[in-house]
Amino acid sequence: QTFVTELRAARAPVDGIVEGDLVVRGGGDSTLDETTLWGLAAQLRSHGITRVRGRVLVERAPFGDLTCDTVDRCTSLLRSSRAYNAVPSAIGVNYGSWCVMVRAPQGATRAQVGGCASGPLPIPLSGSVQVRAGGPALAVERVTDEAGERIAVSGSIAPGSERMVHRAMSDPPVGTGLLLRSILGQAGVTVDGGVETTLRAMGQDAWLVARVESIPLQEQVGRMMRWSNNYIADVLTMNVALKARGAAPASLADASAELTALVRRAGAGDAGDLVIESGSGLTTTNRLSAQDL
C-alpha cells in the first residue's frame, strides 16, 4: 500500500507552458517531504515545462477541512515552538511542519537560517541568531498573525555547528504549496500566481503532469513507532476511515471510530470503558488499557 501525490492541470501544457492553475492533489501521504517535492519539480522540467500561468492550487481533499482537535493543536494555530502538535492533513510536507536549518560558519557573527532541503524559506524570517559559544540558547518559533506565517529566531549557536529543527505549520496544505512553489522556481519553473487551497479543484480527467508514490505503508508505520509521531498516526487514522467508508470522515474523532471497531472485533476493550478519539493519543480523552493494546 502506498499513497500518491499528483500535479494536474486543466489541459495539456503547450510549448512548455501550463495555462491556468497547477493543482496539487494529495492522497494522504503521512511521510511526504521536501525531497518528494523536488521529485515533482524534476518531472515538470523533464516534460519541458518552464512556466505556470496560474496559481499553485492545493486540494484539501480527500480529507477535507479538519479542525484542531486538542488544546495543543488549537494553540499551535497561532504559534508553535514544537513539531508534535501539527494538524493532520491529506497533504502536508515534513509531517505538517517547517524544517528549519540553522548553520554557524566559522568566522561569522550571525548564523544562516533557511530551509532544510528547500533552499530559502518561503515565509518571512524575523530575528537573528548569534554565532558564539556559551551564549543564550537557540530559540525557533513559528508565529501566525493577520500577515500570515513567519519563523521567529533568537539566541545563539556555537561556531562551526548546525541545528535542524521542525516547527508545526498552522496550515499544512498552504505550507506545502508555498514550499512547492519555491522549489519549482529554483528548478526553473516560473509560477505567475500565488498559493491557494480548495476542497477539490478538478475531476480525475484533469491532465496528469507529475506523480509520485509514497514509501510503503509498512515503513510509515515503522516511522510512527520509532519516533512516536502524532502526525503520521492521525493521518493514517484518517486513511483507515476513508478506505473503510469510501468517503471522508467528518473529523479525526469520527475517523477513530474505525479503530474502536477494530479493537472490539479483536475481542479487546470493555464496551463501557473503551474510548478512541485519535490514533496518536494526543487527545486526552482516549481511554485504552494496556490489555486493550
Region roles according to the model:
Residues T2-G272:
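Conserved serine DD-peptidase/penicillin-binding transpeptidase domain
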Residues E258-A261, A268-D292:
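C-terminal soluble interaction/assembly domains
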